[in-house]
C-alpha cells in the first residue's frame, strides 16, 4: 500500500 496521507497509521489510503 502506498498511502501518503495515512502512512503513519495503518489505515486505508484515500
UniProtKB/Swiss-Prot annotation:
Q: Which family does the record claim for this protein? A: Belongs to the bacterial/plant glucose-1-phosphate adenylyltransferase family.
Pathway given for this chain reads:
Glycan biosynthesis; starch biosynthesis
Q: What is its EC number?
A: 2.7.7.27
Q: Which GO terms describe its biological process?
A: starch biosynthetic process
Q: What does this protein do?
A: This protein plays a role in synthesis of starch. It catalyzes the synthesis of the activated glycosyl donor, ADP-glucose from Glc-1-P and ATP.
Q: From which residue to which does any coiled coil extend?
A: none
Please write the reaction equations for the catalytic activity of this protein. alpha-D-glucose 1-phosphate + ATP + H(+) = ADP-alpha-D-glucose + diphosphate
Could you state one GO cellular component term attached to this entry?
amyloplast
Q: How is this protein activated or inhibited?
A: Activated by 3'phosphoglycerate, inhibited by orthophosphate. Allosteric regulation.
Q: What is annotated about its quaternary structure and interactions? A: Heterotetramer.
What's its top-level EC category?
transferase
Q: Is Oxidoreductase there in the keyword field?
A: no
Q: Does the record carry Transferase as a key word?
A: yes
Q: Where in the cell is it found?
A: Plastid, Chloroplast; Plastid, Amyloplast
Keywords associated with the record: Allosteric enzyme, Amyloplast, ATP-binding, Chloroplast, Nucleotide-binding, Nucleotidyltransferase, Plastid, Starch biosynthesis, Transferase
Know the name of this protein?
Glucose-1-phosphate adenylyltransferase small subunit
Under Gene Ontology molecular function, one entry of this record is: glucose-1-phosphate adenylyltransferase activity
